[in-house]
């Protein structure tokens, strides 16, 4: 916003620091991120759009989650009719896009956890996208394979068959006690297994997510998680900072989370470590 308002990078940085009390390092990161986003935006034309498909189901509901998502244990019966309705909506959406003369640049299947669906259900959704939208200009097809315990070789073959170019495996942490605290029903070993399967399939782009500030985590634990992510050599590593959201179990149950200084220590480790590793 500050740059768009005509401020120089130096003025924008000073504005962030003085008005929002952003630390100098975070202000510099914000400017760098803004410049990267602006560069990407300049490539887009007015008729370019992105298509997002949401799969609101997960194996379990994470403690930090406030998304419209349900555990399949509680809502298993809703999955088949949801897929039916979704495929119909994709078809209708494709017709609207054609009539409007719009061009699809990216397709993103998020959630929830899309890989909660069966291989057959994922095949149906991706087939609906292929038959409903012109993919000629589509540069990226992403599917969130967020929960390692939902990833199977069969599902990954479906993704590759449909030309998925990017998958995201989101361990969030490798610390066993933290995984339990956030309500995950998998172990760090399950992440190893999932990443091995993903590597075998040869996806063009693989991302991994971590969250700084999860319940029961420590600065040392976060460092171990980040270092372990690096051993897989993913194309991207996305580090989120925990957001306290209304409706999440962290707030409703008062789960213990690291303090601001600890989270800052985590982030101060992440940035130089990732840059040194070439990210």
Regions found by a protein language model. Give the residues of each.
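Canonical Radical SAM [4Fe-4S] cluster-binding loop centered on the CxxxCxxC motif
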Residues: 48-83
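Alpha-helix C-terminal capping/termination sites
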Residues: 5, 275-276
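Short, charge-rich amphipathic segments
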Residues: 8-27, 52-60, 120-126, 195-209
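N-terminal [4Fe-4S]-dependent radical SAM core
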Residues: 4-52, 100-101
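Conserved non-cysteine loop/helix-boundary elements of the Radical SAM core domain that shape
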Residues: 69-270, 275
